Amino acid sequence: METDAATTELVTVPLRVRRPGTVDLDRAILALSDLSWLGRPTDRPRDRPQLRHVATDLDLPILDGSSTGPVRKAAFIDLGPARQVGDLILVEIAWRSASFAPLFPVFAGQLSVSANDIVLDGRYAPPVGRLGLLLDQALLHLVARRTADALVARLAMAFES
């Protein structure tokens, strides 16, 4: 039985978040070397031992006033080693849901830290393939962006001077 390549193809969506601010690069390197502030370190992925694996919560801020705080979702964040390239610190970053993983997006990208900003740039796969892509266009992209904004704000608190 043949499968249609279009139905098995992984659909991803670009996601880029930039947070301007004054970043202490030495503090960022220190924070990226010990991730206990981000969550509970867990076993490294066997297929990518250079990554550090952290169990944490990702926040979705609710901005319409209907909730007093963010919605939280247990997640695993993978971070590669911090590499200094000129005036930038570059770190591979990925995350996925810690439970019901097929129902939530999976992100992979790069974190770029400079003295003036923090940039998260990558792609995520919406859940449930092409249907998820349609849902993403209607609503889920907003959820993904707010979640990424909240994570970058959390990183900024650890990095900024």
Language-model features: locations:
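Hydrophobic ligand-binding cavity/cleft-lining segments
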Residues: 1-71
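Short amphipathic alpha-helical segments, especially helix-boundary/capping motifs
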Residues: 2-5, 85-87, 129
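Surface-exposed beta-strand edges and their flanking turn/coil or helix-capping segments
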Residues: 30, 104-108, 131-135
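A conserved amphipathic terminal alpha-helix motif
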Residues: 125-161
